[in-house]
Regions:
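Basic, flexible Lys/Arg- and Gly-enriched helix-loop patches that mediate nucleic-acid binding at interfaces
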Residues: 2-172
Length: 174
């Protein structure tokens, strides 16, 4: 059984895979694989578990190269065109948003997603914590969308939208 002091020590710092991902070296999953491959050392000792928490004072190396410190948190606006999938990879081989970004951009994450046939503002960030905070419905932030409809929908067709519809357990109003 964990005591409060032991629990505090375990929770200090961040998981090493998260720190590697935050530094822009690799995704969290790729960082976990790099760790399991024995390529990561913390304070000179090779580690084989991604469960290790590290503090900012710890020296992390990958293949004996010191991991750079994480860059400042940034947020970019991207005007997503129709026809791109909001994903890092698409199992169907379709073009993804990340294929369209400038090569000079650091590794970024999309905040939410837009459907393949949708266009408009997509936020990108280099910080997974910010991404999660912006995506969570519990933040209570109002999201507004502008929708274009092809043709002229009838009142009967629009009535459910005017009454509000449930999407992902949330009541949405127009």
């Amino acid at each position: 059984m964990l005591t409060k002091d032991m629990d505090k020590k375990i929770k200090q710092g961040d998981r090493v895979a998260k720190v590697i991902a935050r530094a822009g070296f690799a995704s969290r999953r790729a960082a976990e694989k790099i760790i399991l491959d024995g390529r990561v050392a913390v304070n000179g000792k090779t580690i084989l578990s991604a469960a290790l928490n590290v503090k900012p004072t710890d020296k992390i190396t990958i293949d004996e190269i010191i991991l750079p410190t994480a860059p400042a948190t940034r947020l970019w606006k991207y005007n997503k065109p129709v026809g791109l999938v909001t994903s890092e990879k698409d199992e169907k081989g379709r073009k993804v948003v990340f294929d369209n970004l400038p090569a000079s951009l650091p590794r970024v994450l999309s905040v939410g997603r837009l459907d393949l046939n949708s266009e408009g503002l997509l936020l990108l960030t280099n910080d997974g914590v910010l991404k999660r905070k912006l995506e969570l419905p519990s933040t209570g932030w109002t999201r507004k969308y502008r929708v274009r409809v092809n043709g002229e929908p009838s009142i009967k067709l629009l009535q459910p939208l005017m009454n509000g519809i449930i999407i992902d357990l949330s009541l949405i109003h127009i």
